[in-house]
Design a protein with these regions (language model features):
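Positively charged n-region of N-terminal signal peptides that target proteins for export
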Residues: 1-4
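Bacterial N-terminal signal peptides
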Residues: 6-15
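N-terminal, polar/Ser/Thr-rich
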Residues: 18-65, 92, 137-140, 159-161
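Intrinsic-disorder/low-complexity, polar/charged segments enriched in Ser/Thr/Lys/Arg/Asp/Glu/Gln
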Residues: 49-51, 63-69, 77-81, 109, ...
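Beta-strand-rich interaction surfaces with strong enrichment in secreted/lumenal proteins
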Residues: 53-55, 70, 100-101, 112-116, ...
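Surface-exposed beta-strand/loop patches in extracellular or lumenal glycoproteins
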Residues: 69-88, 159, 165-174
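A surface-exposed beta-strand-loop module
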Residues: 85-142
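Extended, low-hydrophobicity, Ser/Thr/Pro/Gly-biased non-transmembrane segments
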Residues: 127-174
């Protein structure tokens, strides 16, 4: 009898260990970048390249508009969780591999379900309006000081220091 209980307990523990709740976006999307989210993305995403575009209007009262294309590699489909600290209506459109895709905006993140992600290279394009908190706009110039964990206030990204990436930046200025 003790043997059966012991084997049953071992089997239950083994089955629970095989589950991967880390892959569920709801477990990873809390405000900011949790250690679990950072470790998840470091393990699953590589070869990251950002192609950023910002349109700066002549009038300071008009909002800056932005677009980012993020290319990345993944060995198997995983949920894509991008950091973007802005209101949901500031996300205008999201495309994945050239097609519009369903997404949610929750707790400072843009989330795309793993069903939409392919093994290999993926390209996500987000049209957005940046939050003003990181933009220091003056009459003749604009600057930003993106200290660690603040890039997500300006554009959708993987805002963690252990995911290195290449950047291409294009500005449309008056």
């Amino acid at each position: 009898m003790k043997w059966k209980i012991g084997m049953g307990t071992c089997l239950m523990i083994g089955l629970m260990a095989c589950q991967s709740p880390q892959n569920e976006p709801s477990k990873l999307t809390e405000e900011g970048v949790s250690l679990e989210l950072a470790q998840f993305r470091k393990a699953h995403f590589s070869a990251i390249h950002y192609q950023l575009f910002f349109s700066i209007p002549a009038e300071r009262q008009q909002p800056v508009e932005g677009e980012v294309e993020i290319r990345f590699q993944t060995e198997q489909p995983q949920p894509l969780i991008l950091d973007f600290r802005a209101e949901p209506e500031q996300v205008k459109q999201v495309e994945l591999n050239g097609q519009s895709v369903a997404y949610t905006v929750q707790a400072e993140h843009i989330v795309i379900a793993k069903e939409h992600i392919s093994a290999g290279e993926n390209r996500v394009r987000v049209h957005f309006t940046p939050a003003d908190q990181s933009l220091n706009r003056r009459e003749e110039f604009l600057y930003t000081l993106l200290v660690p964990d603040r890039a997500r206030t300006l554009f959708p990204c993987f805002d963690q220091p252990n995911l290195k990436a290449l950047f291409t930046l294009t500005l449309e200025v008056p």
